[in-house]
Amino acid sequence: MLNPLNIEYLYLSKLFDNSLIVFNKRQLFRFFVRFFFMTAALPNDSKPKLTPAWTVIFFFTSIHLVALLAFLPQFFSWKAVGMAFLLYVITGGIGITLGFHRCISHRSFNVPKWLEYIFVICGTLACQGGVFEWVGLHRMHHKFSDTTPDPHDSNKGFWWSHIGWMMFEIPAKADIPRYTKDIQDDKFYQFCQNNLILIQVALGLILFALGGWPFVIWGIFVRLVFVFHFTWFVNSATHKFGYVSHESNDYSRNCWWVALLTFGEGWHNNHHAYQYSARHGLQWWEVDLTWMTIKFLSLLGLAKDIKLPPETAMANKA
C-alpha cells in the first residue's frame, strides 16, 4: 500500500496517463512543495532532528561553483570536453555502475582481484564518498528501501532522495561497518577509502600536465557534476518516474532516460526485484550497457559466477 504522503505523486502519475484531473494553482503549488520536500508534510514531532554535514555541503558546493568556470572561453576546448566524457565513462560507468554497484555491493559477478581493484580506483575517482560508505549505504538502501531507515527514503521527497540526505549526519552512517564486513579488512580498499581526495588530486595533476586548466576544469569539476547528478537520479527519479514490471515492495520504477545516462542503472524496478542480478535491462529494448560490458568480460574469461534472474523474468529478452 502506498504511503499517504505520496498521494500527490499519484495525482501526477494519473495526469501523465492522460487522466482528466485538473489542478488549480494552489493544488499545483502544494504538489510541487510536497513532491520535492516531502518532509514538509510531516507533523513537526515526526521530523528527524539532523545535524548539517557542513564539510559535505562545502565540498559539493565548491565542486559546482568551480565547474561554472567551464563557461569562460579560456577554459574551453573540445579536447577538454572529450576528456570529461572519457572520464565520465571510466568513473561513472566502470567505477560506480560496474564496480561499486554490481560487482562489489551486490557481488553479481566475480572478477580477478587486480581487476576489482581497478574498479575500486575508478569508483573512488567518482568522489561519491569512499568505497565503504558507498557500498554500506547502498546495501542499507536495499534492505530498507523506501522506509524510514533507508538513507535516501523517497517518501521524504525528490530533493531528499536526490541530494538532501547527504547534507546531514544521518544515523545510517553509524551502521556502515556492519554492512561492509566483507571488504573492511582489505588493505587496498582501506587505502582508497583513506586517500579519496589525494587520488583525485593525483588525477588533477595528470590532467594539468596533459592539457592545462581546461583539462582540469572539465576533467575534474564538470565531469564530477554530471557523474554526481546522473548517479543521484537513480536514487530520486527512478523512485518517482517510469513503469513497474515486477513486485518489489517499494516505489522503484524503470526509467528509460535515467538508464541512458547511467549505463543501464535506470531499469531500477527490475534491479530491486532481482537485486543480485548482473543484468538490469530484462527486456530486449531495455538497453543495459553495463550488462553488455559484463558479457564482454565473460567472453574474455574475466567475469565469472554471473548471477541472473529466473528465466520467467526475462521471458521476452533478446
From Swiss-Prot:
Enzyme Commission number(s) from the entry: 1.14.19.28
A single Gene Ontology CC term: plasma membrane-derived thylakoid membrane
A single MF term (Gene Ontology): oxidoreductase activity, acting on paired donors, with oxidation of a pair of donors resulting in the reduction of molecular oxygen to two molecules of water
Keywords: Fatty acid biosynthesis, Fatty acid metabolism, Iron, Lipid biosynthesis, Lipid metabolism, Membrane, Oxidoreductase, Thylakoid, Transmembrane, Transmembrane helix
Keyword tRNA processing carried by entry: no
Motif (Histidine box-1) on chain: 101-106
Ranges annotated as spanning the membrane: 56-76, 80-100, 117-137, 201-221
Domain of life: Bacteria
GO biological process: unsaturated fatty acid biosynthetic process
Catalytic class of the enzyme: oxidoreductase
Domain statement: The histidine box domains are involved in binding the catalytic metal ions.
Similarity remark: Belongs to the fatty acid desaturase type 2 family.
Protein name: sn-1 stearoyl-lipid 9-desaturase
Organism in which the protein naturally occurs: Synechocystis sp. (strain ATCC 27184 / PCC 6803 / Kazusa)
Gene: desC
